[in-house]
């Protein structure tokens, strides 16, 4: 997972390129789900959980270029939502790159409401990027 994240994101707000970081978060408040094809990870996403307030951020979404447009991310988001709802979570949200139409389309098609844009909010890749906020309540 760390290797795929390091290939997919040149810069990222959290150290997903470090295996120890991923393992540490797995044992705290983060769920990681993935799609494999022929024994290789082709898509992955996570949910950072806030159990006290029963909300979770769907984040760290990545699909390798050759597998984009095949519905993997929507499958992962649905699976994360199912797991979270079984744990009594009521609200899901995400901040995703405004410049990435695929991930925005995925959240929109799954019934998330666009609630705004944070301008120059997150340092990913070559600089600061605008981030769209999407929310869904059960």
Task: Give residue spans per PLM region.
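Conserved beta-strand-loop-alpha-helix junction that forms the acyl-donor binding cleft
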Residues: 94-104, 121-122
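Short hydrophobic/aromatic beta-strand or adjacent loop that forms the aromatic wall/cage
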Residues: 30, 129-133
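Conserved GNAT acetyl-CoA-binding A-motif
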Residues: 84-97
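Conserved catalytic-core motifs of GNAT/GCN5-like acyltransferases
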Residues: 93, 113-128
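A conserved beta-strand-loop-helix scaffold within acyl/acetyltransferase catalytic domains
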Residues: 6-65
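Conserved acetyl-CoA-binding loop-helix of GNAT-fold acetyltransferases
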Residues: 63, 69-84, 105, 109
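Short beta-strand-to-coil "C-cap" segments at the C-terminal boundary of structured domains/repeats
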Residues: 135-138
